[in-house]
Structure formats: C-alpha cells, structure tokens
Amino acid sequence: MSSLTNPTTVMEEEEVPVAAPIRRGNKNPRRYSLVHQASCETQHHIGIRRQNTIQHRKQLTDQMREQKILQQLNDEGVEVIFAANDVSSIDFSVIVTSTDYISTFVSDILYNMKSAGVQICHVETRESKAVSGHDVLLDCRATKNQLIKAAELLTQNHVALTHFSIFSKKSVEKSQSMIWFPRHISELDQCSKCITKYEPTTDPRHPGHGDDEYIARRKFLNDQALEFKFGDEIGYVEYTEDEHATWKAVYEKLGGLHESHTCSVYRQNLKILQKEKVLTADRIPQIRDVNKFLQKKTGFELRPCSGLLSARDFLASLAFRVFQTTTYLRHHKSPHHSPEPDLIHELLGHVPMFSDPLLAQMSQDIGLMSLGASDEHIEKLATVYWFIVEFGLCKEDGKLKAIGAGLLSAYGELIHACSDAPEHKDFDPAVTAIQKYEDDDYQPLYFVADSIHDALAKLRKYASSMDRPFSVVYDPFTKSIETIQSSADLEKAFSRLSNDLSAITHAADRMKISITA
C-alpha cells in the first residue's frame, strides 16, 4: 500500500518526455496521499470529540445547579468533570479570571475551594491579558462532586468572575495511553481496514470505469486480500496476459531511467532481484517469492491488502517490518501512472528499497514512532514518510537521484523531480513534518537527503523530540512490541542488549588474537 489514490483525470505519463509545468488551483488532486488521509482522520476525530463534548455539556446541565459556570467553562473542563467520579480524587489545574481586587479574589477562591473540600496544592497570580483584572492559576485535587461544588460556589459568591477553565494535568499522557496499537504482528489483522477513495465502479475518471472485466478482476483480487489473516500462506495469483503486458510495459519504460535518475542503492538491489529472477520483465512476480527474498535481506515482508489504509494502521504495520501491499494492477489504458496504490508501484518502487538495511530501518523507525502517537503526530509522521520514503531524493556525484518509491515507479514524475523545474530543499524531519503537501500536478517541492544514512540519523534525532509518555522497542524474536515506562522495562531491554554486545565483544577479541598471532 503506497498511499497513492487520486480522483482526477489520469495523465498518460509516457507521453511526457520532459518535466511538466506545475498547475495550481485544481480542486481534484492527482492522488489522495497518505498525508491527505492522515489530515482527514485528524479532522474526523476532532469532529467526534467536539460532538462528544457538546453531548457531555448537555448532560452536565442536569448535575449542576449553577448554569453560569457551564457557559464559562472550557471544553477540556467539561471533559475533566464528566470523566471524574465521586470515589477517587483527580489532579487538575484551574485558571480563573476576575476584575475584582486581587486580594479579594484570592480570598474568595481559597474560602470557596476549602468549603467544597478541594485540596489546593499550588497558587500563582498574574495580570490578565484578556481583561482589566487578574488571573489565578491553581493546581488542585478533588472528587467530581467537590469540583462541581467549588465551581458553583465560586460562581455564585464572586460576581466579578469573568473566566473559568479547568485542565487535566495529565491529559496528554492519559489520551496517548488510551490509544490502541498492535503489540504483536498477529494484531495487524486489526489494521487492515481499507479506506476507499477511487474506484472504477463509482468514479468515471478512473481509467477502468466501464470496463466490467477489469472491475470484476479487481474485486476478485481485493476479496482475496481481505480474507488474508496472520499465519495464512499467501496464495498464488494467476495473472492474465494483459496484466503481464502492463507490467512489462512499465518495467521496460522505467529501465531507461535507472542509470540516470535512480540512486545507487536502488540500482544495486534491482540488479540482485533481477539476477535471482525475483523481478523479471516478462512475468509479474508472486508476493510470496518476493517475501522470501526480502526476509533474507532485511526481514521485511509484504502483506496483501485491498487498497489505501488509514495512516495510523499503515504506519503501525511498518513497525513490524510489514508493508501492506495491493495485489491488483493499474488499468492497461494508463500503464505509466498509478493514481492509487497498485502492485507495480509496490514491486518496482518499494521492494528494491526495502532490500536496503538502512531504508528498511528508517521505515521501521517511522512505524515505531507512530505507535500510540497523537493524531497530530500521526499527521506529521505521515508527511515525513510521504516526502522521503515515497518522494524523496538524494545527492550522488552532484546529481539528484530518486530514493522514493512513488518516483521510482512513475516515469513522468521521476523525470520532473530530478529536473530544475521544482524546488528542492534539504531534508529536515522537523521542517518536512509541517510542510503542506501539494499535488495539483507534479509536486512543486521535493526534499533531498545527503544519503539514506543521513536521513536515518536526522529521523532518529527528530524522534527524540516527540512527546510520548513511553518508548517502544521491537523484539524481532517474538515479533512483538515492548513498551518502556518503568525501570523494570528498561532493565529487561538492557539485558537483551547486553547479550548482543557480549557476542560482539567476543568476536572482536577473537579478531585481535588473529591479528597479533
């Protein structure tokens, strides 16, 4: 699954011998990217949370006698009160604002909070920037009823109160700890929900629209992919002669650009794949045969899926060195451009690069960084992935060469990306993560790494800046994820590392003996 989906008129890229001009203002992008999908998911979740808060605010009206407080209370405050209970106390912060004298204001706060049974742990005051008055910040501990009573008393007894906000002291940690993510490779069965964007059955702009034979074939392959579960043997697919012909056309067309436009890592691994007859021009390779090769090289494997997944599910799969892969091919009418994920893109774009240990590690690192991450961080990681793993460039011998699979499998855009037409920026994950993605036509901007090693080093530095209440480690022996939150977790991780270092140290000592002998 390369995250390429597009509802626009398909471009015949084989007819574009030079870089195409960049057009702006097109409401229908050439492809719905992983970036677009992550953004949509973020907005969807924001909408759900907003609707929940509205509902919770309505429900709290029945529990609170003083309605004025609900009018002033912030959305997070509504959720803090709603989630609290009358048995255990919670820690929270309060910011209240008043136009009264500060001494009177603080006195009223302390009196009413104490009357309600609220424990005050910390108090700060400052001049208010919003009104002519003062803000008071309090760190508190209370039960739900105590919190509601304190809010009602203060609202009733301090008429100059203009603002009342409540914040959970551990809202970020709590929300992230509640985000589910797979802990074992078998749980990727729960990360295979396809997000349909661009189908020949519904979109007249799809090259296969109206082609009943192509539609039926695509459905057959997608249905097979949907049935796949962890532990199943990947089935043998009997591809048609038309599909083999489409594969061959793309394979041979791109071959003319390999030496001039692709990075040395890609060329080296492609030659090995060709030498071992994993990839040949005449026949579409079987996924299970490709997996045998990848497992020996980097431990990566392809898993059948039926199309574009959610950004969170797709990135989570990478954490286990699993790449979710479509099994259908683009329509034969448009062989040199795929506006959606298809098998040609996966095999010719991703497989040679996943054969490289550094690129494989970088992909897995992005996946590990995504586990339990907030929607905001998922969107940033999807953007980083898109701009470097899908459409990244590197410098070799003073020339721009493609490392991104989206470029390596698209003839016209490969030429465009390496030309002087678009803007090129040095790859910096912190900058890349917030770069707006545009794809009205060919992209106007590409990021360039000095090397794959350089990109990996920068990515790991960026990972250290991510705010997550836990760390994760992948155990390749059990194919599972371990979370590190305590010293006991850390000790377990160090124990495994110590065993590896012991073997390396022993090997180094043996080499010293051989050299001196």
Curated annotation (Swiss-Prot):
MF annotations from Gene Ontology: iron ion binding; tyrosine 3-monooxygenase activity
Task of the protein: Involved in the synthesis of catecholamines, such as dopamine. Has a role in serotonin signaling. Required for normal explorative and foraging behavior.
EC numbers for this chain: 1.14.16.2
Swiss-Prot/TrEMBL GO biological process terms: dopamine biosynthetic process from tyrosine
GO cellular component, one term: perinuclear region of cytoplasm
Annotated source species: Caenorhabditis briggsae
Domain of life the protein comes from: Eukaryota
Needed cofactors: Fe(2+)
Listed PANTHER family: AROMATIC AMINO ACID HYDROXYLASE (PTHR11473), TYROSINE 3-MONOOXYGENASE (PTHR11473:SF15)
Gene name for this UniProt entry: cat-2
Residues binding Fe cation, per UniProt: H345, H350, E390
Stored Pfam families: Biopterin_H
SUPFAM superfamilies on file: Aromatic aminoacid monoxygenases, catalytic and oligomerization domains (SSF56534)
InterPro entries, sorted: ArAA_hydroxylase, ArAA_hydroxylase_Fe/CU_BS, ArAA_hydroxylase_sf, Aro-AA_hydroxylase_C_sf, Aromatic-AA_hydroxylase_C, Tyrosine_3-monooxygenase-like
Keywords: Behavior, Catecholamine biosynthesis, Cell projection, Cytoplasm, Iron, Metal-binding, Monooxygenase, Neurotransmitter biosynthesis, Oxidoreductase, Phosphoprotein
Protein family per UniProt: Belongs to the biopterin-dependent aromatic amino acid hydroxylase family.
UniProt name for this protein: Tyrosine 3-monooxygenase
Regulation of its function: Phosphorylation leads to an increase in the catalytic activity.
Compartments in which it is found: Cytoplasm, Perinuclear region; Cell projection, Axon
Modification type Phosphoserine: residues: S33
Keyword Transferase in record: no
Protein's pathway: Catecholamine biosynthesis; dopamine biosynthesis; dopamine from L-tyrosine: step 1/2
Keyword flag tRNA processing: no
Catalytic activity as recorded in UniProt: (6R)-L-erythro-5,6,7,8-tetrahydrobiopterin + L-tyrosine + O2 = (4aS,6R)-4a-hydroxy-L-erythro-5,6,7,8-tetrahydrobiopterin + L-dopa
